[in-house]
Amino acid sequence: MNEALKNILERNSHRNLVEPIPSKDEMEKVFQAALRAPDHAWLRPSSFIQISGDGLQKLSDIFVDFAEENFDDLTEERIEKYRNAPFRAPLIVVLVSTKKDHPKVPEMEQIISTGTAGQNIMLALSALGYGAIWRTGSFAFNNKISEKFGLNENQTIIGY
C-alpha cells in the first residue's frame, strides 16, 4: 500500500501524549506540510502558535483566568481540570485562522483551510512517529481567549 495512504488510514488520535517532542527541524517540516493545505486564492489564512516548556504554564493560567472570569458555578474540580489541561501534552500547536477580505473567498472557507492545515499537521506528526490529538471545547472559537493570546479581531483559534 502507498505510504501516504497507509499513514492516513492508520492515524489515530492519541489522548496520552508524552515526550520526546519533535525537533525544531521536524516541526519545520510539519508546518511546511500544514501550509500545503487547500487555500483558495493563496490567502494563507493559517498560522500556528507552538507551546511547550514554560509556555504550558502560561496557557494553563490563560485557561484558569478565562474560566474564573466567565463560568458561573465554577467548582474547584473544574478549575483543576482547566489548570491541568495544557499538561496533557508536552507540545501544543494552536491553530489560528486569520480572516482576510476577498470577494471570492468567504470566512468559512478560510477557516476550513486552517482546519485542513490542522489535519496535515496531524498526518505529518504521525508520519514522523509522533502521536497527536485535536482539541477544541470552550477555549476554541472564543474571542476572549483569542484576546488573551494577543490576537486581532479577525483571528480565531480553531483548535489545539
Task: State the predicted function of each range.
Residues 68, 87-100:
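Acidic-glycine-rich active-site phosphate/pyrophosphate-binding loop
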Residues 149-160:
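A glycine-rich helix N-cap at a beta->alpha junction
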